[in-house]
Structures are given as C-alpha cells and as structure tokens.
Amino acid sequence: MKQVDIKLFDPRLKDCFPGYATPGSAGLDLRACIDERTEIHPGETLLIPSGIAIHLANPGFAAVVLPRSGLGHKHGIVLGNLVGLIDSDYQGQILVSCWNRGQTTFALEPLERIAQLVIVPVIQASFNVVNDFQHSQRGERGFGSTGKC
C-alpha cells in the first residue's frame, strides 16, 4: 500500500475520514464538503469541494476522480469533465465537477458521497518521431472496426 500525504480542509472529515469501504475497493469515496443542502438542477454543473488535498509526490502516480455508479444511474449525477485527473505534483483541494444530466433536480446533502478517487500508475513517455509505423494487424481502422464476427 502506498502512503499518501493528505490535508483535511473540513474538520467534519475527521469523523468520516476518506477510506476504502472494503478490502477489495479500488476507490475511496469523496464527499460533498458543503454547509447546506445544495440543489443541482437539470443541465446544471457545480464545482463541489471535497474537503481534501493529496500530494502523491511521485510522477509515477496520478489520481483519477470517477463518478459513483449509483448517483449516475439513479439520479443522473455524473462528472462534468467525465474523469478528473490529479497530477502527482498538484497540492490544491480536490474539487468535483457535478453535472446533472437527469431531468429532475437533485438535492445534494452535506457530506454525501459524490465521487471516487483512484490512484493509478503512470508511465511518462518519450516520443520518437517517425514517417511511418511498422504495420500492425489493425492498422488505421477504428470506431467499431474490431470485434466483428
């Protein structure tokens, strides 16, 4: 397990410290660190503070902010940027872009779980400019060209 430095901006998080729900959980829940119930109207996007900052400090890691499946499926609440990327050298508070793609207003409660944070390995590449690629079986075919019977 990788140890990560974390800052708590909201004292309420001491009672519900971010953690993994089960031993097999890939992500830990991020909570809405808001002071009062906040409505997210259909089509609206709001930036919601998570109350935490992390510092991964190693360019071999990044964190991704992902939507919670229940909020998206049941209420239409997904991430406005689809996936949030937290670079290893970012030290500011993590903000969650919540987009209501549903057709009814959603009431977001203080400290409600709104997203998941997953830490992932990163490989930084160096690029070699070429005129042509070595031929592959797939070539330039894309957009549904694979997996056909």
UniProtKB/Swiss-Prot annotation:
The gene is dut. Belongs to the dUTPase family. It holds the Pfam family dUTPase. Keywords: Hydrolase, Magnesium, Metal-binding, Nucleotide metabolism. This enzyme is involved in nucleotide metabolism: it produces dUMP, the immediate precursor of thymidine nucleotides and it decreases the intracellular concentration of dUTP so that uracil cannot be incorporated into DNA. Its cofactor is Mg(2+). Its EC number is 3.6.1.23. Pathway: Pyrimidine metabolism; dUMP biosynthesis; dUMP from dCTP (dUTP route): step 2/2. It comes from Nitrosomonas eutropha (strain DSM 101675 / C91 / Nm57). Substrate binds at residues 68-70, 81, 85-87. It catalyses: dUTP + H2O = dUMP + diphosphate + H(+). PANTHER family: DEOXYURIDINE 5'-TRIPHOSPHATE NUCLEOTIDOHYDROLASE. Gene3D superfamilies: 2.70.40.10. It comes from the Bacteria. One of its GO terms (molecular function) is dUTP diphosphatase activity. This is Deoxyuridine 5'-triphosphate nucleotidohydrolase. One of its GO terms (biological process) is dUTP catabolic process.
